[in-house]
């Protein structure tokens, strides 16, 4: 086993806390930073800057430097709210330019086995926004995972009694895919969600 200095060991440990970074990748990144002190200093400055300036929007809980964020302060359709799990999901929907309403970031998805219950998410804040009136439709854009589906069903059950239309993103076969290579569950969902031509 190789022993590193305390400072290098600490850097390796911190890098491994990042998603998708294992021991080998952490080591490669650490040595790259050691060989490029200017890049390392710029990275450290950038991290300090983003940690001091970026925060969660008090309305939608996306990330922002200004509160409320531009998605909450721009002229948009106040009658539609797209609910996503994470801030990066908000950006993925926004990149399509297909949705012109408001957003709400849950900060996760229901996962009782991992201790993530509705009170650990931004569900209460969503319900408060809806109870304020004026919202016609909530588009649930949670991930198509067990947790995302459970979250979507839970939210639909909570929202429908308010008289607000609840819709879910369509899912199915990706563009450019050959049907023979798509799994059966995806084909089944695509068949169930088929639309008129």
Curated annotation (Swiss-Prot):
UniProtKB keywords: DNA damage, DNA recombination, DNA repair, Metal-binding, Zinc, Zinc-finger
- Enumerate the SMART domains for this protein: HhH1, TOPRIM
Supply the Pfam families for this chain.
RecR_C (PF21175), RecR_HhH (PF21176), RecR_ZnF (PF02132), Toprim_4 (PF13662)
Which residue numbers delimit the C4-type Zn fingers?
57-72
**InterPro entries attached to this UniProt entry:** DNA_Rcmb_RecR, Hlx-hairpin-Hlx_DNA-bd_motif, Rcmb_RecR, Rcmb_RecR_Znf, TOPRIM_dom, TOPRIM_RecR
Give all residue intervals belonging to the Toprim domain.
Answer: 79-174
User: One GO molecular-function annotation for this sequence?
Assistant: zinc ion binding
Q: Which domain of life is it from?
A: Bacteria
GO annotation, biological process? double-strand break repair; recombinational repair
Q: Which family, according to UniProt?
A: Belongs to the RecR family.
Known HAMAP family for this protein? Answer: RecR (MF_00017)
This chain's function reads: May play a role in DNA repair. It seems to be involved in an RecBC-independent recombinational process of DNA repair. It may act with RecF and RecO.
Descriptive protein name? Recombination protein RecR
Native organism is Geobacter sulfurreducens (strain ATCC 51573 / DSM 12127 / PCA)
The root-end lineage is: Bacteria, Pseudomonadati, Thermodesulfobacteriota, Desulfuromonadia, Geobacterales
Which gene codes for it?
recR
């Amino acid at each position: 086993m190789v022993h590193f200095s305390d400072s290098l060991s600490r850097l390796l440990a911190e890098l491994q806390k990042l998603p998708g970074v294992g021991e080998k990748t952490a080591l490669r990144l650490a040595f790259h930073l050691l060989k490029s002190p200017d890049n390392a200093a710029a990275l450290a400055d950038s991290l300090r800057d983003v940690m001091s300036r970026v925060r969660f929007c008090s309305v939608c809980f996306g990330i922002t430097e200004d509160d409320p964020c531009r998605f909450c302060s721009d002229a948009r359709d106040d009658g539609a709210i797209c609910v996503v799990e994470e801030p990066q999901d908000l950006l993925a929907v926004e990149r399509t330019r297909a949705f012109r309403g408001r957003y709400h970031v849950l900060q996760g998805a229901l996962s009782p086995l991992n201790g993530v219950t509705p009170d650990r998410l931004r569900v209460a804040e969503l319900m408060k926004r809806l109870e304020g009136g004026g919202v016609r439709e909530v588009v649930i854009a949670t991930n198509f995972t067990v947790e995302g589906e459970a979250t979507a069903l839970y939210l639909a059950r909570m929202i429908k009694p308010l008289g607000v239309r609840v819709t879910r993103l369509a899912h199915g076969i990706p563009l450019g895919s050959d049907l023979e290579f798509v799994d059966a569950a995806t084909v089944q969902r695509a068949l169930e969600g088929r639309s008129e031509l």
